[in-house]
Amino acid sequence: MLTLSDFDFDLPPELIAQTALPERSASRLLEVDNTNPSAPPRLVDRRFAELPACVAPGDLLVFNDTKVLKARFFGRKASGGKIEVLIERVTGERTALAQIRASKSPPPGTTLTLADAFDVTVGERVEPFFTLHFPDDCLVLIERHGRLPLPPYIEHAPDAADETRYQTVFAANPGAVAAPTAGLHFDDAVLAALEARGVERATLTLHVGAGTFQPVRVENLAEHRMHSESYELTDALVEKIAATRARGGRVIAVGTTSMRALEAAARDAQAAGRPLAATRAETDIFITPGYRFRVVDRLVTNFHLPKSTLLMLVSAFAGIETIRAAYRHAIDARYRFFSYGDAMLLTRRDDAAEATHGGA
């Protein structure tokens, strides 16, 4: 049985990318060819700008069009005590769920001043979050006064460059507190080259929550509880997936967030005895080796943290030994890791279920 320790590896800290490269598509791309089960994976070092040459006409790329909120606030209580607020999810025009760091948990009815700009009122507790009531449209106030919530392993304060580069060029629907980072490599030139090659594009929305950085704290993976995130698939996306299947093309998820949304929707549809359809729902899907993929054939993804649920996901998709070999190569070749790091292109191995935790 696989345990948390099976997904650990040593990463030199200098390989954690602290800033974005000057050009999005100048990042590196490790193409992993693991289609021959009797041979080691073939690892090809590329530039991300070469991605169009790695996919075929008639394939479908599925992007997550979520937009990162300026979700972090510093503020104070009426007593003058300092607080830090991280918006987790906008739940209404004037309400949101948030994490609050303070010397003492604020009870309902407490007034908090955020960014020396406006006051919010603390409402009911929705574990582990607090409900916040805003005086006006919270999306407007968040965008105007908040700070970009860079990941905890990025050590500098967010600056003007981050406000551009920690968003994808196709970000459209505000609601995330972390970027769908595989999408950060795509620029207009790469998108145009994909279109010229006859590769289709579609979007879904999954609002990435702060739980994406939550560590797994249990050795037995069956005991881990995933955070929940909201997602939406449209009729247009579902129709494009069906058309791609009909012409023999491959569905390529851009990022683990797109993967999780597609697979969650397909799993739930199958459980209900119906085909994949447009949906708006919540998912806490936890994909580990043994999971049977229903939609995604290939995956564009960044390099992930040791012991993370995302490392488990890519291991389920491509095979544990394939991922171990790819990560060893990436470290030896000095690839850049995590959100501002480089990317890899993986292909699903249907025999990758070397152990079972995630279930069908």
UniProtKB/Swiss-Prot annotation:
GO molecular function, one term: S-adenosylmethionine:tRNA ribosyltransferase-isomerase activity
GO CC entries: cytoplasm
Keyword tRNA-binding attributed: no
Catalytic reactions on record: 7-aminomethyl-7-carbaguanosine(34) in tRNA + S-adenosyl-L-methionine = epoxyqueuosine(34) in tRNA + adenine + L-methionine + 2 H(+)
Gene3D superfamilies attached to this UniProt entry: QueA-like
Principal location listed in the UniProt entry: cytoplasm
Gene Ontology terms describing biological process: queuosine biosynthetic process; tRNA wobble guanine modification
Highest rank taxon of the organism: Bacteria
Enzyme Commission number: 2.4.99.17
Keywords: Cytoplasm, Queuosine biosynthesis, S-adenosyl-L-methionine, Transferase
Pathway assigned in UniProt: tRNA modification; tRNA-queuosine biosynthesis
Signal sequence region: none
Enzyme category, top tier: transferase
Location in or out of the cell: Cytoplasm
Family: Belongs to the QueA family.
PANTHER family: S-ADENOSYLMETHIONINE:TRNA RIBOSYLTRANSFERASE-ISOMERASE
Quaternary structure and interacting proteins, as annotated: Monomer.
Functional description taken from the UniProt entry: Transfers and isomerizes the ribose moiety from AdoMet to the 7-aminomethyl group of 7-deazaguanine (preQ1-tRNA) to give epoxyqueuosine (oQ-tRNA).
Record-linked HAMAP family: QueA
The protein's name in its UniProt record: S-adenosylmethionine:tRNA ribosyltransferase-isomerase
Gene name as annotated: queA
